[in-house]
């Protein structure tokens, strides 16, 4: 029988000092036999996805206390990728994931907490907490802040839906008037919550649901809706049950590694491919799998991508649907239900509610459930009122979207595409693979060949795009922006958005060893591995070289002979200490970022730290 971890600090005469300190936090004699549960919050006023979380930790803590546990809250950092984007701040985004994971480990292990409730929402916070949870392997439940309502405004006598990406594209389009750009900017992000499309934050919150570590509805129920409060209340109660099951009944099924096992990771990736999620999810799932000691690699993702169809299309791949529409169509479990009927899921998995996948679908799939409360929950909709307050409205759709032939979520028979929304490409300058969000690629450019325009920083590429130096047919290559080379693996949302604003969204390709925002669409290929700074062949590409992209056949090729590539590699090595570094880039890199870069691996490994360098 496992012993409560917290007993280390609450039992025994030699822990009198620790108990004295616990008493100073409000604990009493009756608390010293109860489980101590960490409420890991991520409130910050910097991030709209987290601005409403201040009081939600207390909400969870009160339920923990009422259910027989002791709740102790702490906070992690949270970077807003959208605000950090387009300048040096983006260098810090991905490294913050490791800091979040480490800070959770530090707090939980330093104070011997028995379990956790993780209150996350945005891009690197959910992955960082997920990595920590699987590293620590103590009972955990995730409950996120929820998606933002889609922006809406009237343009050309038509009401259109908007998000952050629209504001960026219109702001850079010289053909758009200042008045229209300002109108879109003011309408794009109307409420608290994670940005309203299937961007990285919402993708990851959907995936925690598919992994079984969060409750049904977590990935899609709006941040502003009153129904979301119940997820927080339930999390506080349920975590005490899970904790007691493990420590008092020796039930290891309550542990995250036994819930989020390899079968669950395969289901989560299957969901991601089917819903056309962010390419960043590949990076984060690979990293989380390593923390869980699960053998889940790019090869597994490649295999899944070849058999899973695209059953859902959401912004940025279309402006017709946002997360509020996904929720109305049944949310994550609506998509999983269709995948299950197609025979594409592992059914022998459980979630934090203790339900198997078939049991969960029976209760929560809107196409089969008889539970009117579930149907009511999935009718939770937007209010269209600007607010930063959680649970501030209770509007509902008049009906559910259960049209699997022409609705937001499709059945296998009526899939948007027989090929899924993500694909892994391999070739002679991406030997370990690269990722493309096929859900956002127009059919006309699934095969694309063109001359390379090479840039050694995102800034240089943006200047060239806006300066008219990139033309129709070009393949823009941005290198030395990987985990080590950036350092920090910047997102390339500005280059892709500016290609659209210049009318080149369907006329050019963009390839990088960096990564893309979940808001990216178009022929945007990222995560090229090995990266340039690690000796990757992408460092050897020169202006004018022909690059051939063939998404249907999962191929990407630099059309040079092996002899020419070898000669260029030899010339690169001859640069000595300057080998595999940018030639003319001026970038100030802090000590903290250099420390990150010294241990960073390429994207095919999840950009995690190289344990072998530490003897691990």
From Swiss-Prot:
Gene3D superfamilies listed in its UniProt record: IlvD/EDD C-terminal domain-like
Catalytic activity line of the entry: (2R)-2,3-dihydroxy-3-methylbutanoate = 3-methyl-2-oxobutanoate + H2O; (2R,3R)-2,3-dihydroxy-3-methylpentanoate = (S)-3-methyl-2-oxopentanoate + H2O
InterPro entries recorded: Dihydro-acid_dehy_C, DihydroxyA_deHydtase, DiOHA_6PGluconate_deHydtase_CS, ILV_EDD_C, ILV_EDD_N, IlvD/EDD_N
Swiss-Prot/TrEMBL keywords: 2Fe-2S, Amino-acid biosynthesis, Branched-chain amino acid biosynthesis, Iron, Iron-sulfur, Lyase, Magnesium, Metal-binding
SUPFAM superfamilies the UniProt entry points to: IlvD/EDD N-terminal domain-like (SSF143975), LeuD/IlvD-like (SSF52016)
Annotated [2Fe-2S] cluster binding sites: 122, 195
UniProt-listed GO biological process terms: isoleucine biosynthetic process; L-valine biosynthetic process
Any one GO cellular component localisation term in the record: cytosol
Cofactor descriptive note: Binds 1 [2Fe-2S] cluster per subunit. This cluster acts as a Lewis acid cofactor.
Modified residues (N6-carboxylysine): 124
EC class of the enzyme, as a word: lyase
Binding of Mg(2+), residues: 81, 123-124, 491
Cofactor: [2Fe-2S] cluster; Mg(2+)
Pathway where this protein functions: Amino-acid biosynthesis; L-isoleucine biosynthesis; L-isoleucine from 2-oxobutanoate: step 3/4; Amino-acid biosynthesis; L-valine biosynthesis; L-valine from pyruvate: step 3/4
Record EC number: 4.2.1.9
Molecular function GO terms recorded: 2 iron, 2 sulfur cluster binding; dihydroxy-acid dehydratase activity; magnesium ion binding
Protein function: Functions in the biosynthesis of branched-chain amino acids. Catalyzes the dehydration of (2R,3R)-2,3-dihydroxy-3-methylpentanoate (2,3-dihydroxy-3-methylvalerate) into 2-oxo-3-methylpentanoate (2-oxo-3-methylvalerate) and of (2R)-2,3-dihydroxy-3-methylbutanoate (2,3-dihydroxyisovalerate) into 2-oxo-3-methylbutanoate (2-oxoisovalerate), the penultimate precursor to L-isoleucine and L-valine, respectively.
PANTHER family reported for this sequence: D-XYLONATE DEHYDRATASE (PTHR43661), D-XYLONATE DEHYDRATASE YAGF-RELATED (PTHR43661:SF3)
Name under which the protein is recorded: Dihydroxy-acid dehydratase
The organism of origin for this protein: Salmonella paratyphi C (strain RKS4594)
